[in-house]
Regions:
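Gly/Ser/Thr-rich helix-start
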Residues: 34-38, 55-58, 89, 97
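Beta-strand->loop->alpha-helix junctions that form or flank phosphate-binding loops
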Residues: 53-58, 75-85
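Generic secondary-structure signature for well-ordered alpha-helical cores
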Residues: 45-48, 72, 94
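Residues at secondary-structure transition points
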Residues: 39-40, 60, 94, 102
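Active-site-proximal loop->helix
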Residues: 58-71, 75, 88-92
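Glycine-rich phosphate/adenosyl-contacting loop at the front of the ribokinase-like
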Residues: 1-53, 62
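Conserved phosphate-binding/catalytic loop of the ribokinase/pfkB sugar-kinase fold
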Residues: 75-80, 88-104
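Short active-site-adjacent helix-start/loop capping segments
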Residues: 2, 59-62, 85-87, 99
Length: 104
């Protein structure tokens, strides 16, 4: 996500002990990533035959379809139906400062 301002205009140093902020991001995009996925994708682009291994959650179906579209096998990916896949949300301001939230 891109924040069309600077975080420093909204995070007040003298009030950092009571930090409560909300940044409106006018656009959102989903990127397919993760270590195994990124390596598999790039190996495939280079003509290789990757075999990604990893653990994913109940929200993997869309990513699985992408892997299959790219002819990347997913039989070594373990799906845990009671959990969500780890994910990261990064918001970047106009100065390229970032605020990251990560769910393992």
């Amino acid at each position: 996500m891109v924040f069309p301002d600077q975080f420093k205009n909204h995070i007040l140093p003298d009030q950092i002990h009571i930090l409560n902020v909300c940044f409106v991001s006018p656009e959102l995009r989903r990127e397919y990533g993760g270590c195994a996925g990124n390596i598999a994708y790039n190996l495939k682009l280079l003509g290789g035959n990757p075999l990604p291994m990893g653990t994913v959650g109940k929200d993997f179906q869309e990513y699985r379809q992408r892997l299959r579209t790219l002819d990347i096998p997913d039989h070594l990916v373990r799906e845990l139906p009671e959990l969500y896949t780890a994910q990261c949300t990064i918001t970047t301001d106009q100065d390229n400062n970032q605020i990251t939230a990560f769910h393992p």
